[in-house]
From Swiss-Prot:
EC number: 1.4.4.2
Modified sites of kind N6-(pyridoxal phosphate)lysine: K269
GO cellular component: cytosol; glycine cleavage complex
Catalytic reaction list: N(6)-[(R)-lipoyl]-L-lysyl-[glycine-cleavage complex H protein] + glycine + H(+) = N(6)-[(R)-S(8)-aminomethyldihydrolipoyl]-L-lysyl-[glycine-cleavage complex H protein] + CO2
Protein's name in the database: Probable glycine dehydrogenase (decarboxylating) subunit 2
Cofactor(s) needed for function: pyridoxal 5'-phosphate
InterPro entries, A to Z: Aminotrans_V_dom, GcvPB, GDC-P_C, GDC_P, PyrdxlP-dep_Trfase, PyrdxlP-dep_Trfase_major, PyrdxlP-dep_Trfase_small
Alphabetized UniProt keyword annotations: Oxidoreductase, Pyridoxal phosphate
Single GO molecular function: glycine dehydrogenase (decarboxylating) activity
The encoding gene: gcvPB
Length: 486
């Protein structure tokens, strides 16, 4: 039975709260709040007893899907299990009760954590300096591109074009466009990697940078990255790495060693903070030495004196691009990432990436016979299948198979991305899934391939067992109409 809205459970006078007796003199609200800020009618808040509120949200949580329930194979999203110790440290009163406007001498523990996290991220990626300000991956992209723009302006060179590989996340060209750049697409070659000849042809004197994801969005390492780095830098351009797929690189190789000038980290992905549904995220950026002076303010600095070690916020950075967020970043995510890194250490981080690569290749080997693979078989942490075979045979599309997977108790993978793969199914199992879970997922995918051949109508009408059947998603996105008056 479909769950009612909390407003539909409301009954007049059925209130689930009580307030302590007021021991202060009664004061009229109108006497302390200007009339323009006062409501003219009571708020239409639901009146529901506590027991029904709890049951309502428990029922909703049972309908929800999350990584603590089962495998969440969204490609390029790194939906790994999030250790609960991260939440424990995040909830420590010394962190959870802070206010960002407190004097820095009263927030030394938080500043130390942020300083040390910056240092660890610098070491992990091989970058000279890090800013923790960006609130998400795309925000990190924009920050990095603004740094690149500032660099070229300081050189007296007004470059107005930015190259983006055609397999890139859509946020790459969007971030560059927001920064005022003209976007030029670079083709992928037959192996799914950057086409060096096409890159060479597009590297002109007005190109500010190349944005690249490594490994790319079909899970392939850019084996020509050193040649790409030489080509870009010889042109006077800079090299930007989208760090969405950093989960494949930890302790194995570093973007800085490949010659990248800017990289953004997705702490909510690689470094294990719960994400999805809008956040919270965290997208710090690491930069090479030539860009360090342009980082957003304030920069956290460590000071040694006769009285000991202290940390301060330095706003005196005349070349800085300024603030990128109201305060200092999404602190709760920073605490979780710090905990994750300290718990694992260098060897543990390397095992994360090794196991992520092993899991992806094992799962791919189980699915190869039933689904098309448009590019080479050896992948990093994720892979991209094509549903062309099923679509051509019986008209069963990737969307249909993704919907049918819900009936088998799994979240669907990323579909129709990257755009260079027809009927794309992008799957990232992450390192935290067991061999048995991978095999159960493969069994479901193989069963769906069988159904696509023998009972295509079933797959086309899926899902059948979910609380809500297939929605008209196009209409929902184009005619969004949420009605809830308060």
């Amino acid at each position: 039975m479909r769950e009612k809205l909390i407003f539909d459970l409301s009954r007049n006078g059925r209130k689930g709260y009580s307030l302590s007796k007021n021991d202060l003199p009664e004061t009229s609200v109108a006497a302390v709040i200007p009339s323009k800020f006062l409501r003219t009618t009571p708020a239409e808040l639901p009146e529901v007893p506590e027991s029904e509120v709890v049951r309502h949200f428990i029922r909703l949580s049972n309908l929800n899907y999350h990584v603590d329930k089962n495998m969440y194979p969204l490609g390029s999203c790194t939906m790994k299990y999030n250790p609960k110790v991260n939440d424990y440290t995040c909830d420590l009163p010394g962190f959870s009760t802070l206010h960002p406007l407190q004097p820095s001498e009263t927030t030394q523990g938080a500043l130390r954590l942020m300083y040390e996290l910056s240092s660890m991220l610098s070491e992990i990626a091989g970058m000279a300096a890090v800013s923790l300000q960006p609130a998400a991956g795309a925000h990190g992209e924009l920050t990095g591109i603004l740094l690149i723009k500032k660099y070229h302006e300081a050189q007296g060179k007004m470059r107005n074009k930015l190259l983006v590989v055609d397999s890139a996340h859509g946020t790459n060209p969007a971030s560059a466009a927001i920064a005022g750049y003209e976007i030029i697409s670079v083709r992928s070659n037959a192996d799914g990697r950057t086409d060096l000849e096409d890159l060479k042809a597009r590297l002109q004197s007005d190109v500010a940078a190349l944005m690249l994801t490594n490994p790319n969005t079909i899970g392939l390492f850019e084996k020509d990255i050193l040649a790409i780095e030489r080509m870009v830098h010889e042109n006077g351009s800079l090299l930007y790495m989208d760090g969405a797929n950093m989960n494949a690189l930890l302790g194995i190789t570093r973007p800085g060693d490949m010659g990248f000038d800017v990289v953004h980290y997705n702490l909510h992905k690689t470094f294990s903070a719960p994400h999805g549904g809008g956040g919270p995220g965290s997208g710090p950026i690491g930069v090479s030495a030539r860009l360090a002076g342009y980082l957003p303010v304030p920069v956290i600095e460590k000071e040694e004196s006769a009285t000991g070690t202290s940390y301060r916020l330095n706003y005196d950075r005349p070349e800085s691009i300024g603030r990128m967020i109201s305060f200092y970043g999404n602190f709760s995510v920073l605490v979780r990432a710090y905990t994750y890194i300290r718990m694992l250490g260098p060897e543990g981080l390397r095992r994360v990436s090794e196991n992520a690569i092993i899991n992806a290749n094992y799962l791919l080997s189980l699915l190869l016979e039933r689904y098309d693979l448009p590019y080479p078989k050896s992948v990093m942490h994720e892979f991209c299948l094509s549903g062309d075979r099923q679509k051509k045979a019986n008209g069963v599309k990737t969307l249909d198979m993704a919907k049918r997977l819900l009936d088998y108790g799994f979240h669907a993978p990323t579909i129709y991305f990257p755009l260079i793969v027809s009927e794309a199914l992008m799957i990232e199992p992450t390192e935290t899934e067991t061999k048995e879970t991978l095999e159960r997922f493969a069994e479901a995918m193989i069963a769906i391939a069988d159904e696509a051949e023998n009972n295509p109508a079933l797959v086309k009408s899926a899902p059948e067992t979910t609380p809500v059947k297939r929605l008209d998603e196009a209409q929902a996105s184009r005619q969004l109409n949420i009605c809830c008056s308060l």
